[in-house]
Each structure stands twice: as C-alpha cells, then as structure tokens.
Design a protein with these regions (language model features):
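Hydrophobic beta-strand segments of well-ordered beta-sheets in folded domains
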Residues: 38-43, 62, 109-116
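Auxiliary, metal-adjacent structural segments of Zn-dependent hydrolase domains
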Residues: 1-60, 122-131
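Post-HExxH zinc-binding segment in Zn-dependent metallohydrolases
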Residues: 89-155
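Conserved aromatic-histidine-acidic binding/catalytic patches
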Residues: 8-19, 69-76, 100-108
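Hydrophobic, glycine-enriched assembly/anchoring segments
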Residues: 142-175
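Non-membrane alpha-helical secondary structure
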Residues: 4, 8, 19, 104, ...
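Well-ordered, non-membrane alpha-helical segments in soluble/globular domains
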Residues: 18-26, 78-82, 109-112
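Active-site recognition of the HExxH zinc-binding catalytic motif
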Residues: 64-95
Length: 175
C-alpha cells in the first residue's frame, strides 16, 4: 500500500486543488465564515471500508481512505473531503457552546452534510437533493434520519439564524 499511496492521493489532491477553495467559500456563504479553517491536516489511510473518513476536531485533522476511484460516483471523494474539513472548526466555543462535547462530533458531521452537498452543487461536483442526502447518510455511515436533516436544513436556509443556534436546534432534534 505504501507504494500505492501516491497513486491514491494524486487524483484527490488534483480535484481538491481545482474545486476545494470554491467549495470551502460556499460552505462559508451557506453557514458561517468562522467554519473555514486556516489549515487542516489530511491523513490518507488504508481503504479498509472502500471509502471512509473521519474528522478529528481537536486536532484540525481529517482521515480519509485512499481509494483509487469514487466508490459512489454521484458522491465524489472530494465532496467527502470537503465535508470532513468543513466540520473542523465546529468545536469553536462561539459555534458549539450549546452542544455537549460528547455529542459534537456526531452533530458536526450531520450538520455539515447538507451544506457540503449544496457547496458541491455550486462547484459542479455533485447534485443536491433529498435522495442524495439519504444516499450520503447510508454510504458515509451516519446514524441519522434524512427527513430530520432535510427539515432542519430547510428551516435553517429559510430563517438563517446564527449557525450556533441552528447547531443547538439540530442537537435537540437528534436527541
């Protein structure tokens, strides 16, 4: 695998360099500019699950499996990478003070999923639909209800409350 890592990293890096900055700008527009990290460490790991990843908020680090091709073509790995990176600043007290730290990683992942799909649509990486959200929940192994997330996201987009308020509301909806 060590010899294969450059082959596995290359396409993802190229896609990120081409679309990642615009993707993150859209995340800031859709949610809160404070979510944009100045830098993040991306660790590419062995593809044990055939596509997977995790955001580790305290270290501003994401781990993503190095797959040779998108396991789910309608959900490109570069969107997964952007989704993971978009979670990293959600541990800022101004954004998450009303969410218990033990629940924050789960709430962060769920909260940023519809934003990531919307950002992906804006930079022409994916579509943004309730069906794709449900597919992302399944394929990216999130324990969440697509209907609840869709309702939360639509309510957020209509009213645009501070993202910290929306995050706390999502936490209560998931309880």
């Amino acid at each position: 695998l060590e010899e294969e890592l450059p082959l596995r990293i290359g396409p993802l890096r190229e896609q990120w360099e081409a679309r990642g900055p615009g993707f993150l700008r859209q995340i800031g527009v859709l949610t809160d500019e404070r979510l944009l990290v100045e830098q993040a460490e991306v660790v590419v790991i062995h593809p044990a699950l055939g596509g997977g990843g995790e955001a580790w908020l305290p270290a501003n680090q994401v781990r993503i499996e190095g797959v040779l091709a998108n396991p789910f073509p309608q959900l490109p790995e570069v969107v997964r990478l952007g989704w993971l990176i978009s979670q990293l600043n959600l541990d800022l007290p101004a954004l998450s003070e009303n969410v218990h730290p033990d629940r924050l990683p789960r709430v962060a992942g769920i909260a940023m999923l519809p934003a990531a799909l919307a950002a992906g649509r804006e930079v022409e990486l994916c579509q943004d639909s309730p069906e794709l959200l449900a597919q992302a929940i399944t394929n990216w192994r999130l324990a969440a209800d697509a209907i609840v997330i869709t309702q939360w996201w639509e309510t957020y987009c209509e009213g645009r409350p501070p993202f910290a308020v929306a995050l706390a509301a999502l936490d209560k909806m998931l309880d």
